Amino acid sequence: MASVLEENGYITESCPRTADSDVESGDTARHKLESLLNRNMRIQMTDGRSLIGCFLCTDRDCNVILGSAQEFLRPSDSFRIREPRVLGLAMVPGHHIVSIQVELETSPQYI
């Protein structure tokens, strides 16, 4: 069973790996990825950086392409303010991805 954690407007879904997950149908995985298209996500990388951008595509090596991406460096003692660096289109190598969080879908609040 997958566990879901909501934090700061982002959702993290962790799926434990089992023998059954290796046999998961390609259609289910494809539909899951299609549901994430054009959604904002935060990707944490092995070097401590995080990228926030719009999910555009992935490949069989788990590389991810983000559009309108911004890079946030790991906060250090000398620089407490985390100002983003605008990257635009960014490719994140799959082997550098630690976690992916998808922004919650919220409907606009009209008064």
Swiss-Prot record:
Please indicate if the UniProt record lists Transcription as a keyword: no
Q: Which GO terms describe its biological process?
A: negative regulation of apoptotic process
Q: Gene Ontology terms, cellular component aspect?
A: cytoplasm; NatC complex; nucleus
Q: Per UniProt, which keywords does this protein have?
A: Cytoplasm
Coiled-coil features, chain-numbered ranges: none
Q: What is its main location?
A: cytoplasm
Report whether Cytoplasm shows up as a keyword of the record.
Answer: yes
Ranges where the Sm domain occurs: 28-106
Q: Where in the cell is it found?
A: Cytoplasm
**SUPFAM superfamilies in alphabetical order:** Sm-like ribonucleoproteins
Quaternary structure annotation from Swiss-Prot or TrEMBL:
Component of the N-terminal acetyltransferase C (NatC) complex, which is composed of naa35, naa38 and naa30.
Write out the function statement from the record: Auxillary component of the N-terminal acetyltransferase C (NatC) complex which catalyzes acetylation of N-terminal methionine residues.
What family does the Swiss-Prot or TrEMBL record give for this protein? Answer: Belongs to the snRNP Sm proteins family.
Q: What is this protein called?
A: N-alpha-acetyltransferase 38-B, NatC auxiliary subunit
